[in-house]
Swiss-Prot record:
Belongs to the radical SAM superfamily. MoaA family. Pathway: Cofactor biosynthesis; molybdopterin biosynthesis. This is GTP 3',8-cyclase. Monomer and homodimer. It comes from Erythrobacter litoralis (strain HTCC2594). GO terms for molecular function: 4 iron, 4 sulfur cluster binding; cyclic pyranopterin monophosphate synthase activity; GTP 3',8'-cyclase activity; GTP binding; metal ion binding; S-adenosyl-L-methionine binding. [4Fe-4S] cluster 2 binds at residues 257, 260, 274. Binds 2 [4Fe-4S] clusters. Binds 1 [4Fe-4S] cluster coordinated with 3 cysteines and an exchangeable S-adenosyl-L-methionine and 1 [4Fe-4S] cluster coordinated with 3 cysteines and the GTP-derived substrate. Catalyzes the cyclization of GTP to (8S)-3',8-cyclo-7,8-dihydroguanosine 5'-triphosphate. Its cofactor is [4Fe-4S] cluster. One of its GO terms (biological process) is Mo-molybdopterin cofactor biosynthetic process. [4Fe-4S] cluster 1 binds at residues 25, 29, 32. The keyword Cell wall biogenesis/degradation does not apply. Residues 9-234 form the Radical SAM core domain.
Length: 332
């Protein structure tokens, strides 16, 4: 074991960084943020150079996969410059550089992203129905998202569709969305609603356990458990009838903490060792200190000591959100 590796107190090796480049987004998805979301002052957000230096510091400590997130990462001005800078490390310590996007800005960036060394991306899409999309995101942007997906496919990017399953919202159209995605050659991952941040709607009413979703899909299709792993929380099945792969992320009904290999850093440089925990370490202060390399490494050691064994997500009538911060702040 290399001395520089990031190992937490439960023996888990941290190899995956989810790095938020902005808390801003051009959608207002009801399960993610309120309509009148108060975004961070720009002065508090790390510069692109600081984000690059931060990522390089993590690579020195054994991080081999970096995912750029938001908010919506592609609304950050000149973010493709950051992608290019990090892409130069792919194959030289960094095994994979990827990002998660809502797809609205993707048509104009897909080729540049692919040229920078990104091989696959995740795209958030909860519905193929224009009215439902507008209700969920509070924006009429489905056509832009579908155009972005088409552009990414044309650029040669491998695409995974992330879909939050919501009772009474999109649960009934999940089979059609899977059929469409698999027909286009895209994997799909279904995600349970997570109790993060104050929003304008009741998550209890929307919560749809994926155990129930899987049972309904098994009545329609032949699902075979897959050995496919991406180092993340998703558990995959192969769908015989569609010829595609389907993942399930179940933080509420079946937590995925034992094999956790990741940390998250916000656009302000706050490291959260756990998506569902309040523990954090300030990396921005280390970056802006007189000895950034040494202080950043020390801060990462501190983060390993406070990473909890598991999250404490709960959802139910009268339950407060597990944490007040929004997913757009943490980096989804």
């Amino acid at each position: 074991m290399a001395a520089s590796e990031l190992i937490d107190t439960f023996g888990r090796r941290i190899s995956y960084l989810r790095l938020s480049v902005t808390d801003r987004c051009d959608l207002r998805c009801t399960y993610c943020m309120p309509e009148r979301m108060q975004f961070l002052p720009r002065a508090e957000v790390l510069t692109l150079e600081e984000l690059r230096d931060l990522a390089v510091g993590f690579m020195r400590r054994g991080i081999t996969k970096i995912r750029l997130t938001g908010g919506e990462p592609l609304v950050r001005r000149d973010v493709v410059d950051l992608i290019r800078a990090l892409g130069r490390h792919v194959g030289d310590g960094l095994e994979e550089l990827t990002l998660t996007t809502n797809g609205t800005q993707l048509a104009g960036h897909a080729q540049a992203i692919a040229d920078a060394g990104v091989k696959r991306i995740n795209i958030s899409l909860d519905t193929l129905d224009r009215a439902t999309f507008q209700r969920l995101s509070r924006r009429d942007a489905l056509a832009s998202v579908l155009g972005g997906i088409a552009a990414a496919k044309a650029a040669g990017l491998k695409i995974k569709i992330n879909t939050v399953a919501m009772k009474g919202v999109n649960g009934h159209e999940i089979p059609a969305l899977i059929e469409w995605a698999h027909g286009e050659g895209h994997d799909v991952t279904l995600i349970e609603t997570m109790p993060l941040g104050e929003v304008d709607e009741d998550r209890t009413d929307q919560f749809l356990p994926l155990v129930a979703v899987r049972e309904s899909l098994e009545a329609r299709w032949t699902l075979t458990d897959s050995d496919h792993r991406t180092g993340g929380p998703s558990r995959y099945v192969e769908v015989a009838e569609t010829g595609g792969r389907l993942g399930f992320i179940t933080p509420l009904t079946n937590n995925f903490c034992a094999g956790c290999n990741r940390v998250r850093v916000t656009a302000t440089g706050q490291l959260y060792p756990c998506l569902g925990g309040g523990e954090r370490v300030d990396l921005r202060a280390a970056l802006r200190s007189d000895d950034p390399d040494s202080n950043l490494s020390t801060a990462l050691d501190t983060a390993m000591k406070i990473k909890p064994e598991r999250h404490d997500f709960r959802i139910g009538e009268g339950e407060e959100p597990a944490l007040a911060r929004h997913m757009s702040m943490t980096g989804g």
